[in-house]
Amino acid sequence: MENTIQMNLFQYFLDEEQFSIKEATDLVNNIKNMNVNNESIRARIYEGVEKGIFTKISRGVYKVTSQIEGHENTCLLVNGDGRDLSMIKDKSVDGIITDHPYDLLKSLKGGNRKFATFELFRYESRDFKEKQRVLKEGAFLVEFLPEESEVNYEYLYEIKKMAQENGLKYFAKVAWKKGTFVSNTGRKSKNMEDVMIFSNGEPRSLKLDAKKNLAVARENNIDVKGLSSYEVRDILQENNLDVYYMKGTAGMLPTVFDYQPKDSKHKIMEAEKPVELIEEIIEYISKPYETLLDQYAGSGNFVIACSNKNRNSIAIEKDNSMFEKMKNNVEKTLNVKFEEIDYEY
């Protein structure tokens, strides 16, 4: 069966320059009627790469690399479909922060999506299956979602159920208060979006265990009286001592994230999020030099926030015009220049 899958793919796509995972699964299951699950097809393709039968190359990928405190920091901008993560290896991403262009037309007439012209859709179970596949164990998924209303409450419930069914555990929800901005549409005035957080299985350990770390300091005769948990951590690390963590985000999540969005005339896109908001979320869900993903990158503020906080980033944007705006925004803000590459993975 394994060789049959590889040979069918090789023969069928022999005259083509490339094929996607989606095209491969369609060939095997619908054209060849082989009734094979997607994981097996993906595994056979990876084996084919190792054997030299296939070469995995993604075009439309732009890369910039910099040195930060002796660490290599990499950003990839991908002009592609954020729902297709086949270019990303299993369990290779330390966190996802994203805001999908949700298809709730009645709620798009006001607020920060009133000029929505991009491709809208509703999440399906397969979207969360892919998110779970690329996330490392315990890693966090952060979804920006609309404040609950009469037109979206069922969809928001579906999102939580689909995430749960694919191994993503509900962790917490924090509102983003948009400063003084208020949208007077619908049945009530609005100035919030929800930041919904899931973990891939049991949440990873990012929260400092203050009691254990103080005990380590005392055992080693280190005076840490009056110091914060973070200062104690730094001293233990300086002395090459173990630092202990508990399950959860890097700190207690706030009651609300309060950040003023830009005026519409200064935005790259209507739905863009403030860099400072993304920076705060990044610090809660990850560590420096880890790799984070935004599937629907829009303005590129996610990339800027990752760079500011010493994180590697992968940012995907499907719309060609928006992709160019994103790239220009990142290059101008960070004073960098991206180069287009053939990205082998």
Where in this protein do the model-derived segments appear?
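Class I S-adenosyl-L-methionine-dependent methyltransferase module
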Residues: 331-345
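Conserved SAM-binding loop
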Residues: 326-327
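Core catalytic lobe of class I
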Residues: 2-323
